[in-house]
Amino acid sequence: MKLPERIFFTGVPGSRWSGIAQTLETMSGMNISDRTPDREYVHHSYTGHKGVYFGPGMEFEPILDSDYIDQAWVEPQGCKLVKSHEWAYNLNQIRTKFPDDWIVMVYRPDMISYAWWHEAGGFAISYPDYRP
């Protein structure tokens, strides 16, 4: 399977989308050069978050510009998993601006997601910064 340059990846907080992201990033051809010790959050026995997350007030805003997005990765080669809760609000723009890239959305029922999000730390997590 030929991977695109980017996969725009989104899910609600608590949907365990970050765990799915980590599984996808084990595939051959994925670029994980966005991972640094500062871009990691561990809770329970999980490394809950790894790599860059795009969002309002975060290190990288959810700006749909290829040069802006790509600067989060050290290496240019390989498929980049571009993670943001905000992509769900911009699906048409993503499809228009990045027609050859993929969009993946993770679904999990709302109350189950809400409960897991709070168990994993909610707004109090260290990375990424979700404080309002």
Q: Where are these predicted regions, by residue range?
A:
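PAPS-dependent sulfotransferase catalytic domain
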Residues: 80-132
